[in-house]
């Protein structure tokens, strides 16, 4: 039978042997039944937006490296595909999502009408999460149970991230993975040309803002 070893020891041994680690990514199943309040699917697969900060969506993805799990919680603007912010942690706690939401709402202009979409994960059903949205006048929307296509925008982002970032790199440590992830998020927002926009998400938002 295998022995459980601390991920830092695994990192040290792999470094001594000159080995690097590939990352595995999979969908995190956060649905635990009706633990709070489930919102209607107001978004209804209307994934386009006329302006920034009209429709945001969020989800959680799970990574595995050096025998340890990491959880990523990003929020994406459907107007231009920009990642507004993200949090990453070793456990899928409520604070992973609440910290993400707090950071995201700091970027939302006052009295701005926003629709925030997610799946029916337990984090998004919690009273604290719903109250944080309500306090800023944000309307909550949820996918139908077990229907990933209702949040395909976020699924598409995770797919791009897999092919462009995770499967092309090897990592020496969890810390290096986090550093490279931050670089990739910046690249994705500011440099990567989105075919539909013919420019990067930030360039598209900047152009729209200047023209308005």
Regions found by a protein language model. Name each.
Residues 127, 134-138, 160-212:
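C-terminal domain-tail junction helix/linker
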Residues 1-51, 147, 202-209:
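Basic, flexible linker segments flanking DNA-binding modules
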Residues 10, 14, 21, 43, ...:
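Mobile genetic element proteins and their domesticated derivatives, centered on retroelements
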Residues 64, 87-109:
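Active-site beta-loop-alpha junctions of metal-dependent nucleic acid enzymes
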């Amino acid at each position: 039978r295998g022995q459980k070893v601390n991920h830092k020891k695994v990192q040290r041994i792999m470094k001594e042997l000159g080995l690097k680690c590939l990352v595995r990514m999979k969908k995190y199943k956060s649905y635990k039944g009706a633990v709070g309040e489930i919102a209607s699917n107001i978004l209804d697969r209307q994934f386009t937006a006329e302006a920034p900060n009209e429709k945001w969506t969020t989800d959680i993805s799970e990574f595995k490296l050096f025998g340890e799990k990491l959880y990523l919680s990003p929020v994406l603007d459907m107007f231009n595909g920009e990642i507004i912010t993200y949090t990453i942690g070793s456990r899928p706690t409520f604070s992973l999502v609440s910290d993400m939401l707090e950071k995201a709402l700091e970027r939302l202009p006052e009295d701005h009408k926003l629709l925030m979409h997610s799946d029916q994960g337990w984090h998004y059903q919690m009273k604290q999460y719903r109250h944080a949205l309500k306090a800023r006048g944000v309307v909550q929307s949820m996918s139908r149970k077990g229907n990933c296509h209702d949040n395909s925008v976020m699924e598409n982002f995770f797919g791009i991230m897999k092919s462009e970032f995770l499967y092309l790199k090897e990592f020496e440590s969890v810390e290096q993975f986090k550093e490279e992830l931050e670089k990739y998020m910046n690249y994705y927002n500011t440099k990567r040309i989105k075919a539909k926009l013919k420019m990067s998400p930030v360039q598209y938002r900047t152009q729209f803002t200047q023209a308005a």
